[in-house]
């Protein structure tokens, strides 16, 4: 079996290439003309001539050319029809009848011999097939496929065999035109190789220049540069093919260049755009890092300011601590003096201090004060210290009396609560009333005690408000300016006001203690101590009967009942009517929350904080209908005790419902005094609540007065109150 044409031994026509050849068969049989024809292409002058390329196509057609030097046109062309099956070609040797003669061999030699002026017919005219002969067919099969090693000794003349490479990769099929040009232009191939390398080098230099110009090589990151080198440099397989095979490089020169082998201008543009974008991102990152660095530096400088602020805060804290220590020391002194006063106090059987032992001390202070006024050589500083000590002692006494009255009031409230639950507490109420009456009597006796001068009594009333304002403000310098300007004036006023108080109290000795306290209070308020009158509010004496009502809302009524004895008494102000203190709301904090809780608890709807202007307008509208309420319209109960600086009612200190109830009770007192009946102001609460809560409040409170009239606890005080008023009018 013969091997395929891809084997190492392939039959080709001799060309101008200097390849190792060997002659098959005896060389003496060749004609001289044939030998000259074979040697003619090797002449230097005919090297660049055209040569005949005889190739075998897929159908086994042999192209032949004519030699102009032979002088005759060879009309005999051979055509071999071979059978190709896959990669195996079967060649049958010629039979016994097919003999090869010397003439035929010479003719074949002439056909294969190429003259110097042989024209290349490739690409000019299609190959023509000629009648075939058994001899030509055998020669064609010998050129198509190589036989075994035994066939190499076939006696053939004029044919040469080129030795193939023993160990090498399969060579690609080279086009005919490339093979012909490579055979005739060896130097041109080398020039093409150098030109291709120059083009590649120029592209590389161009890319590097662009990168240098754009600043890409100056960046610290090497990722984009490695990608550029991978894309700009040619494929290493192409370089290996150029160095290894010359035929492969010729094929690359003739064949169209693939777009992936060398980077195109479009790819370079995209790459440059990508690099520019990356450079822009890097610049943005650098700007962000710079901003963060500046911010960090600013944060590092901030602790200096914080340290200064901390130092200021420490200084303020130290000052506050020093002030607190001073206040604590002053408090210790006050406690020591208070203990001394309590030791001098003469207590009754029930433990209440009936009269203070301040008579000798007061006389001593007055006796010391007289010589001071007579001795001008004493400095003003000593006078100031003496006044401060005297005022401090008076303030301590007032504070002690206030604590005692507060405890009595708490006991009274607890007893009233027990009475409201149905417990038998009438005896306890009578006892508390008796204790309260004794306490008030003791206060009055303390002001009228022979051992205590009227000046000390007046000073007790005049200095209480003055000292309390100092206690809450905590400003020591305020005393200096006030005392310097009013020291002498205060001394002269003491004697005059003391004589006036003696006159007032002396003319009323035949009346009960409650009446004397009632008559003496307006004159104190006229002297400018309005807050002192408010503090004296809870110190109310019992009625003549010596018993208190069980209702907590009527504690303020004894003043009005005593005042109705004299029909010529002026109308009391709203401040006198609203003097009783009610319990603060529980379970809430803040004005808004307490107002909302009160509305939901008692009326089933939320209550917005009441404004001072709105309530004043409602009161004026209601009082305008009452002909006898002109004085009340001028003095509305809108004091800071019930409304804040922003004009909002203090729901967190007092329920608005209790406030309205107190207003209604005050109006009822005035109505009874003026008209003898309180039915005219029964709709006051409905008028106020309907404005703030709407019709729902009226429906919920529609049966309130009926229930109160049926309840013994609620009806008792009101009925007793009405009877007492009628009794007073009759008297």
Swiss-Prot record:
Residue numbers bearing the Phosphoserine modification: 43, 129, 146-148, 567
Where do the segments described as Disordered lie?
Answer: 1-155, 354-377, 447-572, 698-731
- Which UniProt keywords are present, listed alphabetically? Coiled coil, Cytoplasm, Cytoskeleton, Microtubule, Nucleus, Phosphoprotein
Q: Superkingdom of the source?
A: Eukaryota
- Does Transferase show up as a keyword for this record? no
Q: Which GO terms describe its molecular function?
A: DNA-binding transcription factor binding; transcription coactivator activity; transcription coregulator activity; transcription corepressor activity
Q: Where is the composition biased (Polar residues)?
A: 1-10, 62-75, 121-132
What cellular-component terms does GO give this entry? Answer: chromatin; cytosol; microtubule; nucleoplasm; nucleus; transcription regulator complex
Q: Where is the composition biased (Basic residues)?
A: 698-707
Q: Which tissues express it?
A: Expressed in early hematopoietic precursors.
- Claim: Cytoplasm is one of the keywords in the record: yes
- Annotated domain remarks: The C-terminal domain (AA 443-731) contains a nuclear export signal.
Q: What does this protein do?
A: Regulator of pre-B-cell leukemia transcription factors (BPXs) function. Inhibits the binding of PBX1-HOX complex to DNA and blocks the transcriptional activity of E2A-PBX1. Tethers estrogen receptor-alpha (ESR1) to microtubules and allows them to influence estrogen receptors-alpha signaling.
Subunit structure, as described in the record: Interacts with TEX11. Interacts with ESR1, PBX1, PBX2 and PBX3.
What is the protein's name according to its record? Pre-B-cell leukemia transcription factor-interacting protein 1
Recorded source organism is: Homo sapiens
Report which gene this protein is encoded by: PBXIP1
């Amino acid at each position: 079996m013969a091997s395929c044409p891809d084997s190492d031994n392939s039959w080709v026509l001799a060309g101008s290439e200097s390849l190792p050849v060997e002659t098959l068969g005896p060389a003496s049989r060749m004609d001289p003309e044939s030998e000259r024809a074979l040697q003619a292409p090797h002449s230097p002058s005919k090297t660049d001539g055209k040569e005949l390329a005889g190739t075998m196509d897929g159908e086994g057609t042999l192209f032949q050319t004519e030699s102009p030097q032979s002088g005759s046109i060879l009309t005999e062309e051979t055509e071999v029809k071979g059978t190709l099956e896959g990669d195996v070609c079967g060649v049958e040797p010629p039979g016994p009848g097919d003999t090869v003669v010397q003439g035929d061999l010479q003719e074949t030699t002439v056909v294969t011999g190429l003259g110097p002026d042989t024209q290349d017919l490739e690409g000019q005219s299609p190959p023509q097939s000629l009648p075939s002969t058994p001899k030509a067919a055998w020669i064609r099969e010998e050129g198509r496929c190589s036989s075994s090693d035994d066939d190499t000794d076939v006696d053939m003349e004029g044919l040469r065999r080129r030795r193939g490479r023993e160990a090498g990769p399969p060579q690609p099929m080279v086009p005919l035109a490339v093979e012909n040009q490579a055979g005739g232009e060896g130097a041109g191939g080398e020039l093409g190789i150098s030109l291709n390398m120059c083009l590649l080098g120029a592209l590389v230099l161009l890319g590097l220049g662009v990168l240098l110009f754009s600043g890409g090589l100056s960046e610290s990151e090497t990722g984009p540069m490695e990608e550029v080198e991978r894309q700009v440099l040619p494929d290493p397989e192409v370089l290996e093919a150029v160095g290894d095979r010359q035929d492969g490089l010729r094929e690359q020169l003739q064949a169209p260049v693939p777009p992936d082998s060398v980077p195109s201008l479009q790819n370079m543009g995209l790459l440059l755009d990508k690099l520019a974008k990356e450079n822009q991102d890097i610049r943005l990152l650098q700007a962000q890092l710079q901003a963060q660095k500046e911010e960090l530096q600013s944060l590092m400088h901030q602790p200096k300011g914080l340290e200064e602020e901390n130092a200021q805060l420490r200084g303020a804290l130290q000052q506050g601590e020093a002030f607190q220590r001073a206040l604590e020391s002053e408090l210790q002194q006050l406690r020591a003096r208070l203990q001394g006063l309590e030791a001098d106090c003469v207590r009754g059987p029930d433990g209440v201090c009936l009269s203070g032992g301040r008579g000798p001390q007061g006389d001593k202070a007055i006796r010391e004060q007289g010589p001071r006024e007579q001795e001008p050589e004493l400095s003003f500083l000593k006078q100031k210290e003496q006044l401060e000590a005297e005022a401090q002692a008076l303030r301590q006494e007032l504070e002690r009396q206030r604590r005692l009255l507060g405890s009595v009031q708490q006991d009274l409230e607890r007893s009233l609560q027990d009475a409201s639950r149905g417990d038998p507490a009438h005896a306890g109420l009578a006892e508390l009333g008796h204790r309260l009456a004794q306490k008030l009597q003791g206060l009055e006796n303390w002001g009228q005690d022979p051992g205590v001068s009227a000046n000390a009594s007046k000073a007790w009333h005049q200095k209480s408000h003055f000292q309390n304002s100092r206690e809450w403000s905590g400003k020591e310098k305020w005393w200096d300016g006030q005392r310097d300007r009013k020291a002498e004036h205060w001394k002269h006023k003491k004697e005059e006001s003391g004589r006036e108080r003696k006159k007032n109290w002396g003319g009323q000795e035949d009346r009960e203690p409650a009446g004397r306290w009632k008559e003496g209070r307006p004159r104190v308020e006229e002297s400018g101590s309005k807050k002192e009158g408010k503090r004296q509010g809870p110190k109310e004496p019992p009625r003549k009967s010596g018993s208190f009502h069980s209702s907590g809302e009527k504690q303020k009524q004894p003043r009005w009942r005593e005042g109705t004895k004299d029909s010529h008494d002026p109308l009391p102000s709203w401040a006198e009517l609203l003097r009783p203190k009610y319990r603060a709301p529980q379970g809430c904090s803040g004005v808004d929350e307490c107002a909302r809780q009160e509305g939901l608890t008692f009326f089933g709807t939320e209550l917005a904080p009441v404004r001072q202007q709105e309530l004043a307008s409602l009161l004026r509208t209601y009082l305008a209908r009452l002909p006898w309420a002109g004085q009340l319209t001028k003095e509305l109960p809108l004091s800071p005790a019930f409304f804040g600086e922003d004009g909002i009612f203090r729901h967190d200190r007092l329920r608005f419902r209790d406030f309205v109830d107190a207003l209604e009770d005050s109006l009822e007192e005035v109505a009874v005094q003026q008209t003898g009946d309180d039915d005219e102001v029964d709709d006051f609460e409905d008028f106020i609540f309907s404005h703030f809560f709407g019709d729902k409040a009226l429906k919920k409170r529609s049966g309130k007065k009926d229930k109160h009239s049926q309840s013994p606890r609620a009806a008792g005080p009101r009925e007793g109150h009405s009877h007492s008023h009628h009794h007073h009018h009759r008297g």
